[in-house]
Design a protein with these regions (language model features):
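A structural signal for multi-pass alpha-helical bundles of membrane permease subunits
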Residues: 4-296
Length: 296
């Protein structure tokens, strides 16, 4: 009798997994395989133009014929990912340390910090475009009161830092929540023992709290790195990929859907972006796992 119920339970488990597997297949596996296949063709999606298999010609074009453009996009991608990953985690860690303290309206400030995480990327991009626009934006107006021009917003020097800032602002809430959850798991007795030993608040945090939230650091660093390496929508809305913000995501989008619409070459860029993301994530995971073991 138990075998019958056990078999039914397993069947029920498999049935509940089917919808999720179908979604993963339709929106994960099939598009990924299709992109890989298209990267070996000269597909343009132009009606009447046949698609031909070209082998590694698209990849040769990127690494040989147009290496300078690919290199610039790769550098921009790594700069963007490094800036977002480092500062998003630093600010998130600081914010979580503050918001785990007991003070009036702490729940209000927690909600305020998390609010950007529920907004759409397009909404965030358009909102900050209006805020930072040099012609009539509120930031430009405030700077004009001090006799400072806001023309530097569109310069090569400031475009990337501003995009990094907006990306951090958009995702800081989620990062902070993960750190808050990690900090709340640290036993209060450990902090009390550190205080008795004469540890200051700063020393208490770095010597007691930080080593014990290493898993939270691993999660946040990997999510921030993976997310920023494949970001293109926010950059598209804010700068359209100009002023040194032409990341691999923007390079892929412009190649595939702008101008000649070379979907084959764009797919090749997408494959390389995916490979880069996998490599960076694996390296970070291996390093951070070692750090966790060393701290435990």
């Amino acid at each position: 009798m138990s075998n019958v119920f056990g078999g039914r339970q397993k069947s029920l488990i498999y049935l509940t997994m089917i919808p999720g597997l179908l979604v993963f297949l339709l929106f994960g596996i099939i598009p990924s395989v299709s992109t890989l296949v298209i990267s070996f063709t000269d597909y343009t999606a132009i009606p009447g133009v046949p698609m031909h298999f070209v082998g590694f010609a698209n990849y040769v074009h990127l690494f040989v014929n147009n290496f300078q453009g690919f290199k610039q996009s790769l550098v921009a991608t790594l700069e963007f990912a490094a800036g977002v990953t480092i500062f998003q985690n630093l600010f998130g860690l600081w914010m979580a340390n503050v918001l785990t303290k007991r003070f009036p309206a702490v729940n209000f400030f927690r909600t305020l910090v998390f609010m950007p995480a529920v907004l759409g990327v397009t909404v965030i991009g358009l909102m900050w475009s209006l805020i930072l626009t040099p012609s009539g934006g509120p930031v430009a107006y405030i700077l004009s009161l001090f006799g400072t021009s806001s023309a530097f917003f569109g310069s090569n020097t400031w475009a990337m830092p501003l995009v990094i800032f907006v990306q951090i602002w958009a995702n800081l809430g989620f990062t902070t929540v993960v750190y808050i959850a990690g900090i709340n798991t640290v036993p209060h007795e450990f902090h009390e023992a550190a205080k008795i030993d004469g540890a200051s608040g700063w020393t208490n945090f770095w010597k007691v709290t930080f080593p014990m939230i290493a898993p939270s650091v691993t999660v946040n660093v990997i999510l921030a790195a993976a997310g920023s390496l494949r970001t293109y929508d926010l950059i598209y809305v804010l700068t359209d990929g100009v002023h040194n913000t032409n990341t691999l995501g923007m390079y892929m989008f412009n190649t595939a859907f702008e101008g000649s619409g070379n979907l084959g070459l764009g797919a090749g860029i997408g494959v390389l972006q995916f490979v880069l993301t996998i490599i960076v994530v694996l390296v970070l995971q291996k390093y951070l796992n070692r750090r966790e073991e060393a701290m435990s």
